[in-house]
Amino acid sequence: MADQQEKTASSAVPETQPPSQTAETTTQTTATPAPEVQTEQTQPTESGPSAANTTTEQPTNPPAAEASKENAAPAPAPAAEDAPSEPAPAQEQQKEEKPADNKPEYLAKNPALSQLFDRLPTVLSNSGHDEMWGVPLRDSSDVPTVNVLIKFLRANEGNVKLAEDQLTKALQWRKQTRPTALVEGRYSAKKFGGLGYLSTYKDADGKETVITWNIYGGVKDLGTTFGNVDEFINWRVALMELAVKDLKMDQATSVIDYEGEDPYQMIQVHDYLNVSFLRMNPSVKAATKKTIDVFATAYPELLREKFFVNVPSIMGWMFAAIKVFLSKNTTRKFHPISNGANLAREFPPAVKEQFPKVYGGSAPDLHEGARTVALEEDNEPAPAPAAPAEPTEEAKPEQEAPKQEPAPEAPKEEAIKEALVEAPKEEPKQPAVEEPAKTDTAVTTQETVAPAEAK
């Protein structure tokens, strides 16, 4: 029997090859109900190789071959379908990760900063100005620009919308006011002489400390200094811009640590020596309010610490009360000192020695060793021309009138001359105004109460 089977098998090989091809085609056509066979995938995996051998030995049994081919054919099919489906999301993840890798670390760690940079083109378009503190605002690869945006973002506690609004307003204000040009201006020595100074001290490592001094006790006449609010603001802004220049933000090479120390900040000293806290002059109040509004909007996060020196000890309760209503980030910057000679103790020894003697250091007084804005003497009394302005207008039509009436012109010209002579006489009649100068402190009082300027 075995011999007969071998003979029949050997003789049947050439005859069965065509049917095997037809069988394969039939299996491929009949393999459409593969799902039914997939339930048995584990069993045919071992029979797969044997099926190829048994096709020649058992030609009379095509269903077994068909079953094995059906099981073998669909088995790789789902693997082929599953194979591309798995790497697809991996590729998508790589595509998503690539832009994140390309971002600088300060943007990757701070999504709010990245969003603010996305809004920067709109801010520049709406404001029509692209300069802030001497820094031309560019893209996120420009370090000085990054530091400017970080300051506005920190001032608004990470709120992108609020930071965008404040940055827009600050740029609009700079466009209208042109503070960089105010630095080059000249101001009345009579009104502002001795009231504001700027110092830059270096420590042992060469690190600079920028200090602005506001000597409110030096005001001689409240009406003269604060009467013209816009003029006072221009002088105050010019002094601030000088200090901003010394911060050298436009030369920055490293990005500010959003959660760490900001090296681009200054110290402010407000001296209240001989200043009264009891009365508030209306002109002082108006100038103070305008100053706070401007500085709160246009100079955020430029203040490291603020020292109130020569403050009466009785005013200590005011600072204690203020801390209840202000954030810790703001109140930690306020330092009231009753004796100005103790101010230098708050700084390292190398810096301490550079302070004026009156503030506990070894250097000359501020008017000798510190800088200030350009001042000029008033050759003509400023308020005097304002009074005769109206009579001169009346005189003009009379001068243009026919010369038939020369008599009335003479007395009017004399009246004008008398007004010009009397005007300066009225100023010396106000020696008592020197006392109200003490009330100038009201300016700093409000500044201490208002956290806006301290930001």
UniProtKB/Swiss-Prot annotation:
GO biological process, one term: Golgi to plasma membrane protein transport
Subcellular location: Cytoplasm; Endoplasmic reticulum membrane; Microsome membrane
Gene3D superfamilies (alphabetical): CRAL-TRIO lipid binding domain (3.40.525.10)
SUPFAM superfamilies: CRAL/TRIO domain, CRAL/TRIO N-terminal domain
An annotated Gene Ontology molecular function: metal ion binding
GO cellular component: cortical endoplasmic reticulum; cytosol; endoplasmic reticulum membrane; plasma membrane
Record field: catalytic activity: a 1,2-diacyl-sn-glycero-3-phospho-(1D-myo-inositol)(in) = a 1,2-diacyl-sn-glycero-3-phospho-(1D-myo-inositol)(out)
Binding-site residues for heme, renumbered to this chain: Y216, R236, H270, Y272, K306
UniProt-recorded name of the protein: Phosphatidylinositol transfer protein sfh5
Species this protein is from: Aspergillus oryzae (strain ATCC 42149 / RIB 40) (Yellow koji mold)
